[in-house]
Amino acid sequence: MKVEIVAELAQGFEGCPKQAKLLVKAAAKAGANATKFQLIYADELATPDYEYYELFSSLEMSDDDWTNIKNLCDKYHIELILDVFGSTSLSLAEKLGIETIKLHATDINNIGFLEKLAKSSVKRIMVGAGGAHLEEIKNAIEIVSMKQIILFHGFQGYPTPIEDNQISRMQLLKNAFSDYKNVVLGFSDHVDPTHPSSITLPSYAVGQGAVVLEKHLTLGCCMELEDHEAAMNPDQFKVFVDVIRNIELAHGHSTLENDFGMSATEKQYRKNIRRHVVTLDNLQAGKSIGTGDVVLKRTSSVEAFTDIQTVYDKKLISSLHENAPVTKGDVE
């Protein structure tokens, strides 16, 4: 099992190329597989009278700035993922060679844009399902069904209350799209980063089928950058990554073989706990072993029989004392 961890940088770069680069470096150092920014052009997302229009405008950066960020991600071997909100941002994402983009939940019913995504060169689409109805999600996925799809559960509540995460919905989504072999689940929590649930919730989501996790990262909570309410600082994010990597290890690689593909450690445990066939009393050579002559006990002998049924009616070649292990060399 492999869990992809996406450092959600969103709007935390605040339109500053230097800040964006610092976030990329922090994400790479913490062990994230990918970074994700919102590639915003105010005019393709909102009207000038919208309350956050000026904020969106402040996030705009030049094509050269985004090219430099892509090059930095390549240097640190970390994937660059972009939220795109229209033709302009999608065009730049394609120009940059971006393979994975995110469809923000704001566009779950934006049919025209979904059709453009379907025809684009991107390979994977992260579909944000926060606040979306099931039929809206189904319609969106059907339009982009030729792409690899990561269906993301979770929404931003600045921060999101624990009880509103509704992780049980992931099983409903999994069942609803079980016929789509190209759809996998992702989880994006936005809980208070200082609360233990900021690690336990995504860990639980992995157990519910999430193979991609999105977690907000900030340069420092005290800086109160955009989206800081649910963002971990670099040290916290590193702990989060380490926990998820340990979950990957614990998940293991069980198989359908008779021994489930046991590890060497478990095989040794099996040897240590197995009971072996030993005598209940002193037995003389030539005796035919019956049900009252032997029993299963733990013993230091690793050569003794473990299946008691196999020794019944066998004849002893030599005499055995009480609690003696019964081996293949003792019977005929």
Which role does the model predict for each range below?
Residues M1-E332:
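Catalytic cores and adjacent flexible loops of soluble metabolic enzymes
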